[in-house]
Every structure is written in C-alpha cells, then in structure tokens.
C-alpha cells in the first residue's frame, strides 16, 4: 500500500513520497520548471457558452411564459367577441388557436425559456456549485495565466483552503468538495505516474484552526470537506496531521538526541505553533500525542501580509486617502473589498456594475480623479487577484532588497510604485504583533521550555519576521536551519510511510 504526504496550502500545495530512506518530490506544475509546488488557486471557466440554467429556474420561466400567453389568449378572445366583421373574427380565431398551441407546446417553451435565461445570465450570477459541475478546471500556473487572459470566462478561486472552515450552506460545501476533489485527484494522478504504482492513502496537513471565529465547529466542517474530497478523488484512506507537528517530524530526522523544540510555521494562510519533545529513538512511532507539549494556531498568514501591503503601499497611489468635496475621505472599503480575493461574496460585490457606478460617482466629487480611476480599472477588468499577487512578489523581493520599484503596467502604462523595506515593516507590524502573541501563548501553555526553535513556512524567509520574533521573545534560543518550503510536506510523507 502506497501513501503520500500532501501539504494542501493556502498559497501553494506540494506532494511528497517517503520510502523510509529518502523523499521524492512529485512534480505537479509542468509550467514551473524549477520547483515542485503548485499554486493552490483554481480557475473554473467556460470556453464557449455558459452552462444551462437549473431545471427549477427553467420551469419557473416556462410558467411565466405560459402566463403571458394566457393573457394574450384572453385579449384575443376579447377581440373576437367585439369584432363585427367575420374576417376579423376569423383572424382572432386563428390567433387563439395558434396561442393555445404555443401554450401547450412544452418543449418549445422550455427552449425559449432557456434561451432567454442564457441571454440574461452573467457568470457572476452562476452559483458556485453549478460552476463546479459544468465548468472546466485549470490548476496552477496554467489556471492563473488563463484567468489573466480571460477573467470574464470563469472564476478564480484564489485559495479554496481559506473557505473550508467558513460558514457555508449545503450547496457551497458540495462545491468545495468538488473543487478540492479535482485537485486531489490531479495530485494522485501525478504521484502515480511518477512513482509507477497505485497510491491508496494520504496524510494531509491541517492548520490548528481553519477559521478565525468558528473554532472547533469550523475545524470539524473543514476536515469533513477534505475527507469527502479525498474519497471522491480515489483515496481509500486519509489521515490528518497538524502542520507544525509534521515539520517537527522532518527536523527530528536531523537531531542527535532528545530535544524539546519550538516549531513556528508561518504559511500563506495560517500561523501554527507547537512545542514538542523530539527523539530519534521514538521517530518511528505512529502515535506521538504524549510528546506534544503545546499547540496553537490562528489565521495569520502570508496572504494577510500581501493584502496589508496592498493597502499600505499600493492603494494610496490608487486613491486611498483622497478627500471628496465634502471633506470626507474616499470610502476605505473600496480598497479592502478590492483585496478580498479569499472572500467570494465581497469580491463578487466589488466586481458588480453597481460597485463600478459607485466608484465612478465618487470620481466626480474629488478634485483629482486620475488616481481613483486606477481603482476603477481594477474593478472593471477584475484585476484584484493580480494586484494581490503583485504585492506578494514585492514582499518576496523586499526580503533581500531595501527598495524596489513595483511595475503595475497592467493597470496603467508607466504606473510604478516605489516600496521600501521600511514601508513593508510598517505594513506588517500589526500582523507581527499577533504572531508574537501566539508564540507567547504556546510557550505559556507548555510544561517545558524549548531548547531550540525551528521557524519554517514561506514567511520565515523574511528577515523582518525572524528579527521581530527574536526581539525580546526568542532571544538566545538556537535556531534550527530547515527547508522553509518543504519541511511540512516531507514530515507529512514521513507520517504517511508509517500508515502504509
């Protein structure tokens, strides 16, 4: 029985197989020649026509058409009885017969109803479940490039993982089960092709908390969705492991002796922390619950930093902070809604015609509307995901540079924004304060003090983040070097091998 580790991330996902000796990373994105990860975003699209409307909607439209025909029959009858000329009566009689034929021609009425509904339908009005059931899927870089070329042809789900613990109705749950099942089935297919054998089981990483406010209720829902998706994708067995504990199992392979270790995993969507007793002698045991001294987590990830950098570093060049004629500022919600790539209702609202009209009206009551016009361009062309992605690239560049020039020419020719490492620090400070509070919580809940610390996840590559954690918090604690992007998934693969 073959088992793989799956790091299903907020920003990127990864699959690794461990044979007991070495790790094999599964290539997931053919357009990414260097790495083994794949964007977690999914583009669901229609190349030609949109899907037909649901049966209930068609039947309601048919009933409406029948009411209109019935009214026309009544009017024709009135005309017949009021007509004096036999020829005129014959004309009304023919009209009545024709309308009665239309009234009872159900197939023709259904075709007409579908045609009218399709004509009036826009992509944003299609429920997500219907989109999942009828649309085509594009993953990774291919999906993101397709989205950039034809945003009006589909919908980009920027981070499916961010919705798993949220408040969802029945159809929305089924939609995300369908989306994630497609992704997991693709991961399984890639693994089987590259390993040359059937993959039956998986250990999937999970954050300590999937959602910021729904607590254990959100966690239960998220695990249910992931479990159903894995089954639908063809896995016969699936287990879950807290992501910081998975990272601990990877670093445990390098330790010469028993060591109490603090793991700080700062990923794209969440920050997860644990204090754990690691031991080379116990590394092959399946159940390590007694070794976990403390674990905590929260939805505080790199995506929050990206959105914060948009608001602090980019939005001021797009009209944020400008005053209207009445002295009030341009509504700041314009810009938070623009960044809401992980909030489908908010983003759908931002892309609506009414929202664009509201921005246009605001442009008419400010002295210099040129900056706000950039926001309108983003709104009209559905460029939110691209703006947030630009902020992510800026954040990564500022890990090694003091200043950068960020090109935003897809919004406006020659539109560049200067961003410094100092401005990034200011943008990240509120977020970093919350991360530090989470570290304090984990340390206070642990019965033992850590001897070393491992900081992992994409945000661990930022010197701003590491310096902030060591300032008056982790001072003097030796730091274990690790692979920031692969430690979690390699640890998941180690655990998967125990289940195989």
Segments predicted by a language model, with ranges:
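N-terminal phosphate-binding loop and flanking beta/alpha elements of the actin-like ATPase fold
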Residues: 1-34, 57-61, 65-263, 277-298, ...
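Hydrophobic residues embedded in beta-strands of well-ordered beta-sheets
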Residues: 13, 23, 49-50, 271
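Short beta-strand scaffold segments in enzyme catalytic cores
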Residues: 13-17, 40-44, 272-276
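Phosphate-binding glycine-rich/basic clefts of nucleotide- and phosphate-handling proteins
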Residues: 30-31, 35-45, 50-58, 62-101, ...
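Flexible internal linker/loop segments at domain or repeat junctions
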Residues: 407-409, 415-418
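Short, hydrophobic alpha-helical segments
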Residues: 496-500
